[in-house]
């Protein structure tokens, strides 16, 4: 008996130990804590050092793109550019260059020869060959002619530039990281600027870059020649050369209907507007320019057609705005639905619905007394108002106060439910339908992009929303709204005293209580009912449900 009790006691201890092992760890996905067993065993998180501090690097700040034209040269992966791989045929050979020479036939040789300080390479059995100052394209012919002086036949020659002389070049002035940078003599100016981090986009110049050798200026470089015309003079660098980026010169800004909306730099005190436009590249259809001048205490604006740009000048600090300024001469509308005529019509600006209805060719199924009009500008406005209502609803649900812990938990669940509802409602696209009045439909002004729909005759009544079986029911004279709902199984249990609206075929919205008789083509929409202790939330959801039903003919459930 004692043995049996001992076995039970040991088993109970093991079970308690197992349960303690299971419960000792918090869920890291919920708490963000490390497993407690790892801490007890002396294990450390990967992001912690020996002192217990978190070594996780902070996220990198977002890169702010400069508006300065030319700054894109030094953005992205181009900053990691290496030395030039290929060589320019016009490259002039210098002491320190490495030359690959191959001889085969009666005499063979294969080796890399370095140009000595006197400008020579030494070929076995041939002697010194002076190649310094010779272009890369003439190298093979020169070496061949020297070999032929010794071996007149049965010896073939191939010579090529293997590696240019390594050099160190100073990059200074208004660059991000001034200093001394290594490369080869054939590297371009851009290579060295990239190694220095590029031109400082806030202070440096893209049009005033000087390359000096000692006290002598070797070249003046304008990077706009490269950006706009693809021209960049290739100069060979030597040890100790200096690239100097000057300070920012005069600037003007371009905005509006252009392909290059940037701030541009120029060297002179003024620049022709025609040249500025050639840099900015106006989009097709641009008609006018606005010049905003900021000089002294005054700010002036000048407005001209683009055709009058010749002869006008921009000065330092000016802003050039390119715009499209033309009036609407005609409009285009689409006619869809049940008719036998054209589906697109071009009309004079200011035309009315009468001009369209006179050209429509109705057929036997056309319901001409229920013409529908859909307008993009109305749809956009409906979307804006819907988003505003959704924003207010979300704010009301998240700012609700609670007096007890249980009430706070319920409020949190309600806020999550409303957030999911708001996310679904934001995806709804309103139709932009304009409700037409039969008495003055002919005088309705049309806009470009309007869609006119001629509905088709039907004998059905649609029932949507909070009914057991949403369906289409055959129209029958004398049947009421309640009768059609009963045909679809009646209201759902959660609908209660739901709001019911009727949408006529011409787009008119009417409360079900105000409908005397239903017509073929009507739609019955039973809106869901939502109750909350927060009056603002209840009012907000009810408003949004109605907007969705009326504006998009959509019923969303929570």
From Swiss-Prot:
GO cellular component, one term: periplasmic space
UniProt xrefs under InterPro entries: Poly_export, Poly_export_N, Soluble_ligand-bd
Coiled coil, from the record: none
Keywords: Capsule biogenesis/degradation, Periplasm, Signal, Transport
Top-level taxon in the UniProt lineage: Bacteria
Intracellular or extracellular location(s): Periplasm
Entry keyword annotation includes Repeat: no
Signal peptide extent: 1-20
Pfam families assigned: Poly_export, SLBB
Any one GO molecular-function label of the UniProt entry: polysaccharide transmembrane transporter activity
Function per UniProt: Involved in the translocation of the polysialic acid capsule across the outer membrane to the cell surface. May function as the periplasmic binding element of the PSA transport system, in which it transiently interacts with the membrane component of the transporter, binds polysaccharide and transports the polymer to a component in the outer membrane.
Family per similarity comment: To E.coli K1 KpsD.
Descriptive protein name: Polysialic acid transport protein KpsD
Organism of derivation: Escherichia coli
